[in-house]
């Protein structure tokens, strides 16, 4: 968070980042970034979900929960330009234990990172898990992700197909009605 704040505080930053803040406790993201649109007075926001994985644990980064199906689909219906970023931080832990106190002193070092726009994660790498409410989107392996350019509409169609394969078309219609995804005007 501090790194984003330092960049935003520099009015000359090359990213046009103007503001960074932490998400609230139950938000599906950890950080909100606001960028100025070049040569305009408008800005665009990006929600960032931070996923930390351990370098020395083989299963770390396998199928992390990203966000709920209904929540993310609703965001893209309301704003096709919505940006949801997954920031993957791979870390290594250095620690020592003090035998006299039993306390451990440790430091985490970020050894690599990857950044993905959720909308562009390939269909093969993004899975739907029906557990937990409306279901969770998961990345199969956060360290190896392919990117596919697509529109918000194509992204929603892919998510819907995954949901329907898992729960059926009747369940999708019920949810689409509840969240007002189907426009009747």
Where are these regions (language model features)?
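Nucleic-acid endonuclease domains
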Residues: 1-27, 35-46, 52-185
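Ligand/cofactor pocket segment of small-molecule handling proteins
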Residues: 31
